[in-house]
UniProtKB/Swiss-Prot annotation:
Keywords assigned by UniProt, alphabetized: Capsid protein, T=4 icosahedral capsid protein, Virion
Biased composition, class Basic residues, residue ranges: 24-34
Region feature (Disordered): 1-53
Domain of life: Viruses
Site, as annotated: Cleavage: N536, G537
Family: Belongs to the tetravirus capsid protein family.
One Gene Ontology cellular component: T=4 icosahedral viral capsid
Protein role: Self-assembles to form an icosahedral capsid with a T=4 symmetry, about 35 nm in diameter, and consisting of 240 copies of the two structural proteins.
Listed Low complexity bias regions: 11-23
Subcellular location: Virion
Protein name per its UniProtKB record: Capsid protein
Organism of this sequence: Nudaurelia capensis beta virus (isolate Pine emperor moth/South Africa)
Coiled coil: none
């Protein structure tokens, strides 16, 4: 071999010689990146300029399609801040995490401007007749029927019974309640915190404190406060406030579309009908008898019914006196009133017509006649039409609720510590409720007769929202020492009336956002009617709503795409909350097991010491 020839050692890895070349190629590719000139970000809001965005060091590599700006734009929320805020308010109405009232308007573009507000309150329901200083632990239980009402001035209604033989409020209890409600004109006894009593049935309605001193609309429905309104969200949270020793109880919860109707009271049915009624007691001695005839405030001589007690008494004297309570007598002097008496078979024994003068008139009957029924028929030339809000009582029996909707949910109250019921909107379009619909609200049941319904002279004065459901929570098996508390949050959107003090607070409404409306609708379709109490108290529902909104990509624009995306996001958020709940249970179980183990070790140590 030639000594001048040098042999290089063989390379074990051919790629080692290309290492420097590869590094140089990478540096060249990086240098070939295109630099973007500095740009100025657009104006984000009126009167505010965003900071200039310096993209001098931003590079776009060839062959790459995942541009950071595009990716961020695709993953941003598809809704405006006002739309997102309304979704939070609608799906989580009792959450204390958002308090801005201007963000509570419905983004449907239905009205150009409006004002909005919020009603808040906390009330408790105590077993009727229970002394607040006592705590009975005798094992007695009571049912409580809670209605989450879509009324503007009264959000809650409580009904209960003191009959120990009834597990829940029965149909007979509801009939007694409806009859008393429809004929009640003085609501002092039936307004929180007072219970109105009808036999063994008790009920009370919870008013909105903010509207206590606000004058109601006139008889023509003209309001000095607003022309129309609509609820934007409403929710009630029940806190199961029960002693530890007797903390049993079950709640069955559902929501129903209100079967309601705003109608004119038909005077043809009422005015020309002879009213029959109640027990007449023979007062004192002598030939005279007195019947006091009460006429309610609504009976402005125009034909509303005058309910009288059923007459049952002995032989009538020859003359008697019919006395009207002049304080409530509202028909004009000079109108004719017809009085009739009948025998038990129903034959007419006498009929008298006289003219109302000073409120007292004397009528004469046949000697020895037995009065069976007494009636009054008002003869009028002018009839007073009255607006009423007729509404049917929804299913309240636990079995009926289960049959009426598969989304009925049941809670064991000592486990859930209560419940959280956001009220759902069942209408596809959020309509406005006119102030002219203000009038008596009267309940009806499948057993209510036409005669009894049209003879009613009372009813709670209010308006019924056109969109939201009526929530029903049948709580049963609770100890009589249980005092559940209820928190109510309600938001509304209204068009102020001329000269209204709410007028200066009106502002423009957000633009229509179909994505936000679809998100809210899809959520309510997939979720139950109520949640455990911790979904409000611990913010679990707020976290689910926020996570769902954050996961909806901007590029999903069609309604079908939004619905599918929301479904996936809700399932993901639900699984997250469920996993958190599972981990919490595992941690509690681990703590219990650890405590048992420590106790066992201590016990073994003590036994060892004793043996020594």
């Amino acid at each position: 071999m030639d000594a001048n020839v040098q042999i290089r050692p063989a390379r074990n890895n051919p790629s080692q010689g290309n290492q420097g070349r590869n590094n140089n190629n990478k540096r060249r590719r990086r240098r070939r990146g295109l630099k973007l000139p500095p740009v100025v970000a657009p104006i984000t809001s009126p009167g505010q300029m965003a900071e200039p965005a310096n993209h001098a060091n931003t590079r776009v590599n060839r062959g790459r399609t995942r541009v950071r700006g595009l990716r961020q734009a695709m993953m941003e929320s598809p809704m405006a801040a006002t739309s997102e805020a309304w979704i939070h308010d609608y799906l989580d109405p009792d959450g204390e995490y958002k308090t801005s009232l201007d963000d509570g308007k419905i983004p449907d573009g239905a009205i150009p401007q409006s004002t909005c507000g919020q009603f808040r309150g906390t009330v408790g329901a105590r077993y009727p007749g229970l002394n607040s200083t006592t705590l009975p632990l005798d094992g007695g239980t009571w049912p409580l029927l809670v209605m989450h009402l879509p009324f503007f001035r009264h959000p809650l209604l409580f009904i209960t019974t003191t009959s120990n033989t009834e597990v829940e409020v029965t149909n007979a209890d509801l009939d007694a309640f409806a009859n008393d409600w429809n004929n009640r004109t003085d609501w002092t006894e039936a307004t929180y915190p007072s219970w109105a009593q009808v036999g063994n049935v008790f009920y009370m309605v919870v008013p909105t404190e903010a509207l206590t001193d606000v004058p109601p609309p006139t008889q023509l429905g003209v309001s000095g406060l607003l022309e129309s309104y609509r609820l934007t969200s409403s929710g009630v949270t029940a806190y199961f406030n029960a002693p530890t020793l007797v903390n049993q109880g079950v709640a069955v919860i559902a929501q129903f579309q209100p079967d309601k109707e705003h109608q004119k009271e038909n005077p043809d049915i009422v005015a020309g009908t002879t009213q029959t009624g109640g027990t007449l007691q023979l007062g004192g001695s002598g030939p005279n008898y007195t019947l006091t005839m009460t006429i309610g405030d609504q009976v402005e001589f125009g034909g509303a019914a005058i309910p009288l007690p059923t007459v049952s008494m002995g032989p009538m004297p020859e003359s008697g006196q019919l006395v009207f309570q002049t304080a409530n007598l509202t028909f004009d002097v000079g109108n004719t009133i017809t009085i009739t008496t009948t025998l038990p078979p129903g034959s007419v024994t006498g009929m008298w017509q006289f003219t109302a003068s000073n409120g007292t008139d004397t009528v004469t009957v046949d000697a020895g006649a037995r009065l069976y029924a007494f009636g009054a028929n008002l003869d009028a030339s002018e009839l007073n039409l009255q607006d009423i809000n007729s509404i049917k009582i929804p299913p309240t029996n636990m079995n009926q609720m289960m049959q009426a909707t598969p989304k009925t949910i049941q809670f064991q109250l000592n486990e859930t510590k209560g419940f959280y019921m956001p009220l759902r909107a069942f209408q596809p379009v959020f309509e406005m409720t006119m102030a002219t619909s203000y009038g008596p609200v009267r309940w009806k049941t499948p057993r209510t007769t036409v005669v009894d319904y049209h003879r009613a002279i009372g009813g709670l004065q209010d308006t019924i929202d056109s969109n939201f459901a009526i929530g029903v929570a049948a709580m049963t098996g609770m100890s009589t020492s249980t005092v559940p508390y209820f928190k109510v949050f309600r938001r509304f959107e209204a068009i102020p009336a001329e000269g209204s003090p709410w007028g200066p607070f009106a502002s423009a409404t957000p633009p229509k956002d179909d994505v936000a409306l679809t998100v809210a609708r899809t959520w309510t379709d997939l979720h139950p009617f109520a949640y455990p109490e911790r979904y409000n108290g611990f913010g679990a529902l707020f976290a689910m709503v926020a996570k769902t909104i954050a996961q909806i990509p901007r590029y999903v624009r069609s309604a079908a795409g939004v619905a599918n995306a929301v479904t996936d996001c809700i399932e993901s958020a639900t699984e997250s909350v469920a996993s958190n709940s599972t981990s919490e249970r595992r941690q509690r179980r681990a703590r219990r097991v650890g405590g048992i183990a420590r106790g066992a070790r201590n016990l073994v140590g003590r036994i060892g010491n004793l043996s020594l």
